[in-house]
Amino acid sequence: FNESFATAVERIATPLWLQTHASEATLQRWQQAQTRRALWQHLTRQTRARLHSIYERNAAQPLDEKALAAIKKEVFSDFQAQYAQLRAQWVAADEPLLTSDTLRQQYLERLAQTDDWVARANNASFGALAAYDDWVAAMAHWWTQLQNGQPASPEGWKRFYAQMRELASMQPEQRTQQLCAHQPEQLAPPAACQASTARP
């Protein structure tokens, strides 16, 4: 919850600040970064869902270790291959911006960190990512509702923070139900919402 809240505030507040303080080029670069983030999130969530499905099937009808390892290996291989495609697109698009050796080195160092994460990723890695992303869409949607159709204002932010403090004080199951209720309909719900719905 706390991780998603921090991420939600960043993604809500940053474009508001950029619209009034940044150049059009800077705003466009930020929007491009958000598009890339969305593609990355889709890929990691898709992979996490596939792994979750494997573990559920294995719990219902256990596989031998070799068969389970082979299935998981295929999932991670698919993940790495799809990341490689995204990576190639990003590098090609960013090449004109790497106008000095220093910029290129910094860029490649940041990219290498993601490369290393992808190479080492396991089920726990995807679970950690979910902590930062699962509730961001619900919180952003909630923030929009609390603005009452008006431009962002201090009063709107106060209402949002008050609502988030109330959420933080709830029991985890109740908090999950509230967040699931505010998940935008056009987006696939987090796994926690599906588990909550399935629970008797």
Feature names for model-found ranges:
Residues 1-9, 124-131:
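Active-site metal-coordination segments of metallo-dependent hydrolases
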Residues 2-46:
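Post-HExxH zinc-binding segment in Zn-dependent metallohydrolases
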Residues 45-200:
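Pan-zinc metallopeptidase signature
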